[in-house]
């Protein structure tokens, strides 16, 4: 009797086990049927991301969930976290790019904040790449951000660029622009390139799918160093440069989601102007140049040449040497201050900044004639001088913002206008603010 009861208990236990196994199998079958009906494109795509990116996924041109997955599985390298890089980074991280690299060795300064929208007042003194990462991680925790607080150069460019799918050139230096182009072409990376100054800018897609034209195809030789104006010298309207950065983000999304194909992509150059009326013009560009030194039929630019520093990008692009005067032709801001204090008659002071800068802040009794490399404007200086002014003996002091243009102007005045006693003020008005009058505004 006891043996019979034991056998029945064993059968009941086994039946319960089989019923449990059956329920597990039913659940697995249901999951398989569900997955067959609603396939998982990416098991790492969570419900939060559906909500986060839903408004862009429903746009027909975007490409729905598959395009969103492409963005998540993509990586971009942004070189320069400034006026172009910040808005591009802002929108691309919000759009769901999976991995973002940021290269910038510059430090956040208060003068950056009107246009470099990832940085805040609290970021002043931080590396720009680290400041940008801090903002991005708060905006979208699904994005992986890697920072490179270094200057891109021959030795590190290949190692950095190789880790990413696409490169955004958000720099403002010709030498770096050529380096980015050459390394990206040799690494078979597409480049989204932008530039901007004052209220104007332009953008293009280079080396698309490793078949489109590159930067050297359009510009085999760099512009003269004298013709290059930086944001600090020429100025920039924040929203204008920001619009270019946002446009770069749009083009990047098009490339990464496959909107552009080998068949439909045509090389282009988009040009934007903010004043007097905003306008965007798009120009068709030619294809690859067979004579291009990096992507042509007989290239002379190679990975080995770059790594061995056989290509000097700074020398290739040139630079303006502002140190053109002897020590005898220059005085310090303190020396000029002593002259002003000591003399009853105000010295002749020529300010060679633009009229816009002159209106911001100026020293008393200064004459404003903008420095012009052609030297035409300075020829009118005579009419501003006292009638008894003697070019052979009387001093005329020349000042600018940083002490660069004033050197060039002083040299021209001595060599071509016969001002024998022209003197450059070392360090310009910025140094005046540092040493003589801290209340004199810097801008």
From Swiss-Prot:
Any Gene Ontology biological process: tRNA wobble position uridine thiolation
Q: Which residues carry out catalysis?
A: 231, 400
Cofactor(s) named in the record: Zn(2+)
Q: Where along the chain is Zn(2+) bound?
A: 214, 217, 292, 295
- Going by the record, the broad EC class of this enzyme is transferase
Q: Which GO terms describe its molecular function?
A: adenylyltransferase activity; ATP binding; metal ion binding; thiosulfate-cyanide sulfurtransferase activity; URM1 activating enzyme activity
Q: Which PROSITE patterns match?
A: RHODANESE_3
Which UniProt key words apply to this protein? ATP-binding, Cytoplasm, Metal-binding, Multifunctional enzyme, Nucleotide-binding, Nucleotidyltransferase, Transferase, tRNA processing, Ubl conjugation pathway, Zinc
Instruction: Give the record's cofactor note, including how many are bound.
Output: Binds 1 zinc ion per subunit.
Q: Which superkingdom, per the lineage?
A: Eukaryota
Q: Which SUPFAM superfamilies match?
A: Activating enzymes of the ubiquitin-like proteins
Q: Where in the cell is it found?
A: Cytoplasm, Cytosol
Q: Which residues bind ATP?
A: 83, 104, 111-115, 128, 172-173
Using the UniProt record, give the first listed, main subcellular location: cytoplasm
The segment(s) forming the Rhodanese domain are 343-441
Q: Per the UniProt record, which EC number(s) apply here?
A: 2.7.7.-, 2.8.1.-
Purpose of the protein: Plays a central role in 2-thiolation of mcm(5)S(2)U at tRNA wobble positions of cytosolic tRNA(Lys), tRNA(Glu) and tRNA(Gln). Acts by mediating the C-terminal thiocarboxylation of sulfur carrier URM1. Its N-terminus first activates URM1 as acyl-adenylate (-COAMP), then the persulfide sulfur on the catalytic cysteine is transferred to URM1 to form thiocarboxylation (-COSH) of its C-terminus. The reaction probably involves hydrogen sulfide that is generated from the persulfide intermediate and that acts as a nucleophile towards URM1. Subsequently, a transient disulfide bond is formed.
Which family does the record claim for this protein? Answer: In the N-terminal section; belongs to the HesA/MoeB/ThiF family. UBA4 subfamily.
Q: What is this protein called?
A: Adenylyltransferase and sulfurtransferase UBA4
Q: What is the lineage of its organism?
A: Eukaryota, Fungi, Dikarya, Ascomycota, Saccharomycotina
């Amino acid at each position: 009797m006891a043996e019979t009861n034991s056998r029945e208990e064993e059968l009941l236990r086994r039946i319960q086990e089989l019923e449990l196994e059956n329920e597990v199998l039913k659940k697995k079958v249901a999951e398989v049927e569900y997955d067959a009906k609603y396939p998982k494109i990416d098991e790492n795509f969570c419900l939060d991301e559906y909500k986060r990116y839903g408004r862009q996924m429903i746009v027909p041109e975007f490409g729905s969930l598959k395009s969103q997955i492409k963005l998540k599985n993509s990586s971009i390298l942004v070189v320069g976290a400034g006026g172009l890089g910040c808005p591009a980074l802002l929108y691309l991280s919000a759009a769901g790019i999976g991995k973002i690299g940021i290269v910038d060795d510059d430090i956040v300064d208060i003068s950056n904040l009107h246009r470099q929208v990832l940085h805040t007042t609290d970021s002043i003194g931080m590396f720009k790449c680290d400041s940008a990462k801090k903002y991005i991680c708060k905006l979208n925790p699904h994005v992986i951000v890697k920072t490179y607080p270094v200057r891109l150069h021959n030795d590190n460019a290949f190692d950095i660029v190789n880790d990413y799918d696409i490169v955004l050139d958000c720099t403002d230096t010709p030498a770096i622009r050529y380096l980015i182009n050459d390394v990206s072409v040799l690494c078979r990376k597409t480049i989204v390139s932008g530039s901007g100054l004052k209220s104007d800018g332009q953008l293009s897609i280079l080396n698309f799918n490793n078949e489109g034209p590159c930067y050297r195809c359009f510009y085999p030789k760099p512009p003269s160093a004298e013709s290059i104006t930086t944001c600090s010298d020429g100025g920039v309207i924040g929203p204008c440069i920001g619009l270019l950065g946002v446009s770069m983000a749009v083009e990047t999304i098009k490339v990464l989601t496959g909107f552009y194909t080998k068949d439909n992509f045509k090389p282009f150059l988009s040009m934007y102007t903010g004043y007097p009326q905003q306008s965007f013009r798009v120009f068709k560009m030619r294809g690859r140049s067979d004579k291009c030194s990096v992507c042509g039929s007989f290239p002379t630019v190679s990975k080995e040449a770059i790594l061995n520093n056989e290509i000097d990008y700074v020398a290739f692009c040139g630079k303006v040497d502002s140190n053109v005067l002897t020590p005898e032709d220059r005085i310090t801001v303190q020396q000029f201050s002593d002259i002003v204090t000591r003399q009853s008659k105000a010295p002749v002071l020529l300010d060679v900044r633009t009229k816009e800068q002159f209106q911001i802040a100026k020293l008393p009794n200064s004459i404003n004639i903008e420095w012009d490399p052609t030297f035409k404007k300075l020829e009118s200086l005579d009419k501003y001088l006292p009638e008894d002014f003697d070019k052979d003996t009387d001093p005329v002091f020349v000042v600018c913002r940083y002490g660069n243009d004033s050197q060039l102007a002083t040299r021209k005045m001595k060599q071509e206008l016969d001002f024998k006693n022209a003197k450059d003020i070392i360090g310009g008005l910025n140094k005046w603010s540092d040493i003589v009058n801290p209340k004199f505004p810097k801008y």
